[in-house]
Amino acid sequence: MAEEAKAKGNAAFSSGDFTTAINHFTEAIALAPTNHVLFSNRSAAHASLHQYAEALSDAKETIKLKPYWPKGYSRLGAAHLGLNQFELAVTAYKKGLDVDPTNEALKSGLADAEASVARSRAAPNPFGDAFQGPEMWTKLTSDPSTRGFLQQPDFVNMMQEIQKNPSSLNLYLKDQRVMQSLGVLLNVKFRPPPPQGDEAEVPESDMGQSSSNEPEVEKKREPEPEPEPEVTEEKEKKERKEKAKKEKELGNAAYKKKDFETAIQHYSTAIEIDDEDISYLTNRAAVYLEMGKYNECIEDCNKAVERGRELRSDYKMVARALTRKGTALTKMAKCSKDYEPAIEAFQKALTEHRNPDTLKRLNDAERAKKEWEQKQYFDPKLGDEEREKGNDFFKEQKYPEAIKHYTEAIKRNPNDHKAYSNRAASYTKLGAMPEGLKDAEKCIELDPTFSKGYSRKAAVQFFLKEYDNAMETYQAGLEHDPSNQELLDGVKRCVQQINKANRGDLTPEELKERQAKGMQDPEIQNILTDPVMRQVLSDLQENPSAAQKHMQNPMVMNKIQKLISAGIVQMK
C-alpha cells in the first residue's frame, strides 16, 4: 500500500535515515506513480544526502504532476542550489512565488539563492554589470550604431557568452563590434582605430586648398522620387481596419455606460468589417459575460482562440479569451464536475501567458471544486462509522489500516476533531511525526477544549525532544481541563527532562544531539549572533561581576535560559 510505504518513508526521514526513506518513497512511487507528494519527499531525502542531481529529477517530476503546488518549486530551487546553479535556483523560487506569493519557505529560499548569486559574482569584471539583464539588448537595439550587429549570429553568441561569464569580455575586446557595444552600454564614445590603406583620410594640412578666387560650383540636387500610390487593395484594408477600430471604441464607450445591447451591436459590426482582430470577439464575450449570457460568451471565446491561432495573434489575446471562457464556465458550475472544464481553460490560458489574475481564478476554481466535492461527500454518520473502523484497527495495532479509515472519516466530515486526534496517534505510532503534529494541531483548531488534542501534540514534541514546547502544550491543555491526569503527568516528564539538562546530567551523546537541535532553531541562532549576547557569554566565563549585572536584566536572563534549555550553555 502506497500510504503505508509513504508513512514508513516519513518516519525514516524524521529519524535521519535518509537512505531508508528513499527506499520507502521509491516503493510508494511504484504503487502510486502519479502522487506528486511522494516525488517531493524523495527529492528532499536525496537533497539531505547531497544527491542533488537525483533531487533535481524528482523535483521536476513533482512540478510536472502538480504545476501549481508551491512546494515543488521549493524542492526545485533547493536542488539547483545544491548543484551551484544559483541563477536557476532564483528562477525556480520566483516561479513558486508566482503560484503562492505569500509562501515563506519560497521567500527564504529566494533570499538564499540571490545571496549565492551575489557571492558567485564577487570581484566581477569592472564592466560586467553593463552586460547584465535584458536592458543590454534594449540599449543595443535602440542605438543605430549597434542595431545592425544584432543580425549577425556570431556577435549575438559573443554577447550571450559575456552575459553568462563577464570575465570572458577580455577575449573579445579585439572585436570592434564588442568595443562599439561596450561604449554604447557605458555611455562612452571610444575612438575607433585609424583606417588602413586607401581608406585613410588625408589630414587637412596636407590637402591642396582651392583658390579663393575660384567660384564654388553648387551641386545639383537629385530629384527625390515621388511616393508610389498605395495599392487599392491595401488602401481598402487600411480603411476597413480604421472603421472597425472606431466601432470598437464606440462599443467600449457603450460598455462603460452599461449599455450592453449597443456595445454588442458595435462589436458585431467591427467583427463583420475586420475579422483579423480577435479583440472584437473577446470584447463582445466580456459583454455577454456581464449580461449572464454564458453560452454566447463561451462561443465567442472559442472563436477568438481558433481565429487567434490561425492569425498567430499575440499570446496575451488568446490567453484573455481562454480566461474569459473559464470565468463563464465557473459561473455556470452547479457541481464539482462542472469546474473541470473551467480549470482546464484557466490552465491553457496560463500556458499561453502567465497572468496573476488568471492564476487567482484558477486557484479559486480549484478551491470551489474541492468545496463542492466535500459538500457532496459530506456525511457525518458514515464518518462516525469509518472512525469506529479505524479505532478497531488501532486496537489491533494495524496503524496503516487505521489511518486509511480515519482519512475516510475526515473526508466524510472535515470538522470531526476526534478523527484528526486518532489519526495523529496512528501517525505517531508509525514514527511519522510531522504528520502526527499536523493532525494534532488541526484537532486543537477544530475544538480548543478537547484535551486529547493537546496530549497528542505534546507527545510528538516530547518524542522530538522539544521539551520546552511540549510543556507549553501540556500547560495550554490544562487551562481547559485542569484535572486531566495525562496532561499533568506530561508536565512532570517535561520538567524532569529540562532539569536533567539544566543540571548537566545528560550523556555526551544526548548533549551533542540537544545542541545540534538547538542550533537549528532560528531564535537560538539570533541570540548567538547578537553582539550584546556574545559579550554577555564572554563575561559569564571571564568576568563574574559583570555577568551578575547582566543577569539583572530580564531580557538577557530569558535569552540565557533559552540557551541553557538548548544545551548551548551549561550552568555549574
Curated annotation (Swiss-Prot):
Residues 189-248 are annotated as: Disordered. Keywords: Acetylation, Chaperone, Cytoplasm, Nucleus, Phosphoprotein, Repeat, Stress response, TPR repeat. GO terms for cellular component: cytoplasm; extracellular region; nucleus. A motif (Bipartite nuclear localization signal) lies at residues 241-258. Residues 232-248 have a biased composition (Basic and acidic residues). It is found in: Cytoplasm; Nucleus. Phosphorylated. The modification Phosphoserine is found at S167. TPR repeats lie at residues 2-35, 37-69, 70-103, 244-277, 279-311, 319-356, 358-382, 383-416, 418-450, 451-484. One of its GO terms (molecular function) is preprotein binding. InterPro entries: STI1/HOP_DP, STI1_HS-bd, TPR-like_helical_dom_sf, TPR_rpt. One of its GO terms (biological process) is chaperone-mediated protein complex assembly. Residues 133-172, 521-560 form the STI1 domain. It comes from the Eukaryota. SUPFAM superfamilies: TPR-like (SSF48452). PANTHER family: HSP70-HSP90 ORGANIZING PROTEIN 1-RELATED, TPR REPEAT CONTAINING PROTEIN. Mediates the association of the molecular chaperones HSP70 and HSP90. Mediates nuclear encoded chloroplast preproteins binding to HSP90 prior to chloroplastic sorting. Co-chaperone that forms a complex with HSP70 and HSP90 and preproteins (e.g. chloroplast preproteins). This is Hsp70-Hsp90 organizing protein 1.
